[in-house]
Amino acid sequence: MNKPVELIIFDWDGTLFDSVGQIVASLLFAAQQFAQPLTADAAKSIIGLGLPEVAQRLFPQVPELHTEILQCYAEHYVANSKGDVWFDGVADMLNGLREAGLQLAVATGKSRKGLDRVLAQKQSQTLF
């Protein structure tokens, strides 16, 4: 039995939004501030995870610094973000899917606060 599609769930970072560069830059900055080794490839490898798991994977040697490192990362990300950028064609595609009556959702490791901030910047709160 074939059922019509009613809901589409999208990944966020690196799928809908071109935010990978800013995430990596902010993680590298935070690591440097706390004298922790980190490569760009390692930073890229955790995109999509929640921040607690990011800290556990990237900085297992200093669990006592996880909170401070993540705070530094978040502050750098917000301060240096010029606004996340939809990949080409994504905004039109999402609007078309909504107009066709489909429900859209996001699965992300980004915090709800962070997701809401970006959606508000893009005036896209009603898409998801």
Sequence positions of predicted segments:
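Short alpha-helical
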Residues: 22, 50-53, 64, 92, ...
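Short beta->alpha linker loops
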Residues: 46-50, 88-89, 110, 123
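Short, hinge-like loop/turn segments at secondary-structure boundaries
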Residues: 58, 121-125
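Conserved H-loop
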Residues: 37, 125-128
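Active-site neighborhood of HAD-like aspartate-dependent phosphohydrolases
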Residues: 1-44, 59
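Short, acidic loop-to-helix structural element flanking the phosphoryl-transfer center
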Residues: 4, 79-106, 112-119
